[in-house]
């Protein structure tokens, strides 16, 4: 049976992650409070931030930026939006 959590991002009961997605306290907090659906949304947003801001993931500053954005996305006032990003038109 799937583990259920009250997702802090979607504000509903949903299937939880199978394991903490990050090491440390932030990973544990995400595992306890974030659903698979919300995590998938973050992965798409994270990819957009990496691509639009041309982040080099070998750079420790870029990784630290993404960790801060992860925390803001789920537990703060929302993550940054990529400058100049225009979402595709709805079909």
Swiss-Prot record:
Domain of life: Bacteria
Keyword Iron: yes
Gene Ontology biological process: cellular response to oxidative stress
Iron listed as a keyword: yes
One Pfam family it belongs to: Iron_traffic
Functional note: Could be a mediator in iron transactions between iron acquisition and iron-requiring processes, such as synthesis and/or repair of Fe-S clusters in biosynthetic enzymes.
HAMAP family xref list: Fe_traffic_YggX
Protein name: Probable Fe(2+)-trafficking protein
Organism for this UniProt entry: Cupriavidus metallidurans (strain ATCC 43123 / DSM 2839 / NBRC 102507 / CH34) (Ralstonia metallidurans)
């Amino acid at each position: 049976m799937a583990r259920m959590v009250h997702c802090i991002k979607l504000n509903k009961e949903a299937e939880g992650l199978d394991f903490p997605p990050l090491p440390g306290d932030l990973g544990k907090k995400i595992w306890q409070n974030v659903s698979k659906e919300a995590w998938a949304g973050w992965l798409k947003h994270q990819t957009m931030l990496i691509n639009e801001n041309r982040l080099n993931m070998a750079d420790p500053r870029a990784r630290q930026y993404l960790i801060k954005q992860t925390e803001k996305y789920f537990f703060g006032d929302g993550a940054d939006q990529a400058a100049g990003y225009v979402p595709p038109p709805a079909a």
